[in-house]
């Protein structure tokens, strides 16, 4: 084993942040970047009029609407560790991008609005993380506002998500009466100060404050002591093994907006989160991150991160070995050799040329059309193929045409590049070859329309076709005569045939009429 490579890999902490929209995910990301020294000022997503946009929201539509619609990658050094943050869209219409991103991380941070508790999108994303069996860390956000009782929030983790919650700190008040946090893990009190200055009070051996501290006589602090005693007696016991397996989540309270409790959370996270671990490749082989042969997989493709160059970047999670500039790799899907001369690291849309990266890191490769989402690349003679990434079956479909027939070239270029990102699916009518777009949610169409105009100067006309159910069919079983007014025969961008049904009733009618025909769907 290469000792130097092993030491580099051990320093990596690669994680995604998941939440329901508006729980504060992007804000806590910015505060972490502040502690990492990569930005000097956090811009809140609400501050669109001031121009203080969130660092992770780099796309033009994100700045205009104050939402994240694409996963961002940010990297920085912190306390001797290399931190790779993947900030994901919270909006449910972009869950496919988020799901794929979750395949590229070693742990996850779940941000919950303490006034609302666990919300639908958080629940969906948690299931994906849970299936992967990776550690999950919970940040109960917005403590500076009135919220639900902390004991209820902890109980909800087990009731709704089926995961043990173990409190690492505990609120002393909330909202207007917030006094601070009782730091169980570090045996101290972190006082709440609106100026953002840290002030910590050490606790006595018995967990109380010295009598000389005014807070020791505060009724809220005494209530907190009662709750702490209850937690220690009846609550879940901290267990590193359970955390590593994803069966227990350390819970931290705080306020990302006022930067309260974030540094304490980050310090604990860096200590508890895992370094990169082995991947299953070639269906049943374990591949160590310290394996000397480089390998990785493409989990995201992004067009126009630099609108001036109209480029495409393939995001690669390195699974093993070390990347060096000029590395020769093989694209597993085609067997094509590729030399990796230009690779970048990220601070959202900002890029830095990288000459060295190891397992756990995320690098961006300039893509001239070689890569597809889910592709595996490897440097040695041994072929390495990572597991397939999840694909979703769209539920909304629209016909799309260029408003200006004289701009067909930019229309087709924009269409092809945005579809290759995987956030929207492209189909073509089997008979007429007209374009049909498929998406999980309406917002994806709006973003597509905006980006076509903004990035490709191509205005598009979009009309709903009213079909909601997509099912693939074996080409050998296909008879075009099966198509009628209630099921539209189309082909996906790989040429595979499928039917778009009006609704589930139309699908059932088809299945009853053709019982020997096998129809399949994606996620």
Curated annotation (Swiss-Prot):
Increases the formation of ribosomal termination complexes and stimulates activities of RF-1 and RF-2. It binds guanine nucleotides and has strong preference for UGA stop codons. It may interact directly with the ribosome. The stimulation of RF-1 and RF-2 is significantly reduced by GTP and GDP, but not by GMP. GO terms for biological process: regulation of translational termination. GTP binds at residues 19-26, 87-91, 141-144. PANTHER family: PEPTIDE CHAIN RELEASE FACTOR RF3 (PTHR43556:SF2). The keyword Protein biosynthesis applies. Its main location: cytoplasm. GO terms for molecular function: GTP binding; GTPase activity; translation release factor activity, codon nonspecific; translation release factor activity, codon specific. One of its GO terms (cellular component) is cytosol. Belongs to the TRAFAC class translation factor GTPase superfamily. Classic translation factor GTPase family. PrfC subfamily. It comes from Lactobacillus acidophilus (strain ATCC 700396 / NCK56 / N2 / NCFM). CDD domains: RF3, RF3_III. The keyword GTP-binding applies. Residues 10-277 form the tr-type G domain. This is Peptide chain release factor 3. It is found in: Cytoplasm. Keywords: Cytoplasm, GTP-binding, Nucleotide-binding, Protein biosynthesis. InterPro entries: EF-G-like_DII, EFG_III/V, G_TR_CS, P-loop_NTPase, PrfC, RF3_C, RF3_dom_3_sf, RF3_GTP-bd.
């Amino acid at each position: 084993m290469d000792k130097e490579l092993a030491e580099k890999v051990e320093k990596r902490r690669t994680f995604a942040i998941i939440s329901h929209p508006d729980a504060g995910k992007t804000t806590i990301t910015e505060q972490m970047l502040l502690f990492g020294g990569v930005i000097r000022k956090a811009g809140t997503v609400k501050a669109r009029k001031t121009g203080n946009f969130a660092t992770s929201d780099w796309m033009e539509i994100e700045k205009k609407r104050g939402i994240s619609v694409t996963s961002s990658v940010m990297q920085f050094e912190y306390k001797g560790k290399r931190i790779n943050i993947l900030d994901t869209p919270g909006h449910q219409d972009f869950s496919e991008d988020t799901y794929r991103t979750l395949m590229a991380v070693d742990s996850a941070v779940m941000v919950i609005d303490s006034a609302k508790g666990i919300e639908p999108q958080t629940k969906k994303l948690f299931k994906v993380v849970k299936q992967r069996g990776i550690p999950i860390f919970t940040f109960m956000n917005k403590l500076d506002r009135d919220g639900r009782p902390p004991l209820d929030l902890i109980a909800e983790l087990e009731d709704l998500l089926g995961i043990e919650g173990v409190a690492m700190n505990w609120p002393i008040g909330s909202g207007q009466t917030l006094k601070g946090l009782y730091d169980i893990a570090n045996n101290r009190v972190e006082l709440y100060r609106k100026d953002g200055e840290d002030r910590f009070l050490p606790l006595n051996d018995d967990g109380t404050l010295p009598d000389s501290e005014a807070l020791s006589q505060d009724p809220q602090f005494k209530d907190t002591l009662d709750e702490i005693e209850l937690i220690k007696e009846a609550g879940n016991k901290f267990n590193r093994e359970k955390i590593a397996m994803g069966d227990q989540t350390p819970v931290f309270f705080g306020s990302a907006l006022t930067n309260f409790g974030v540094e304490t959370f980050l310090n604990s996270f860096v200590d508890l989160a895992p370094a990169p671990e082995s991947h299953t490749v070639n269906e049943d082989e374990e591949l160590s991150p310290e394996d000397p042969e480089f390998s990785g997989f493409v989990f995201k493709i992004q067009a126009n991160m630099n609108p001036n160059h109209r480029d495409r970047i393939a995001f690669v999670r390195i699974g093993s070995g070390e990347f060096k500039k000029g590395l020769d790799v093989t694209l597993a899907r085609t067997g094509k050799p590729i030399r990796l001369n230009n690779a970048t690291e990220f601070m959202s849309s900002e890029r830095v040329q990288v000459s060295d990266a190891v397992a756990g890191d995320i690098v961006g490769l300039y893509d001239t059309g070689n890569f597809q989402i889910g592709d595996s690349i490897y440097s040695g003679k041994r072929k390495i193929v990572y597991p397939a990434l999840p694909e979703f079956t769209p539920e909304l479909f629209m016909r799309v045409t260029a408003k200006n027939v004289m701009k067909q070239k930019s229309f087709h270029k924009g269409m092809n590049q945005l579809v290759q990102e995987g956030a929207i699916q492209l189909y073509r009518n089997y008979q007429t070859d007209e374009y049909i777009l498929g998406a999980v949610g309406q917002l994806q169409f709006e973003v597509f329309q905006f980006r076509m105009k903004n990035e490709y100067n191509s205005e598009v006309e979009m009309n709903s076709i009213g079909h909601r159910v997509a099912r693939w069919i074996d080409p050998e079983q296909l008879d075009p005569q099966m198509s009628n007014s209630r099921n539209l025969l189309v082909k996906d961008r790989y040429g595979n045939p499928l039917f778009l049904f009006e609704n589930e009733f139309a699908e059932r009618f088809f299945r009853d009429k053709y019982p020997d025909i096998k129809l399949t769907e994606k996620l």
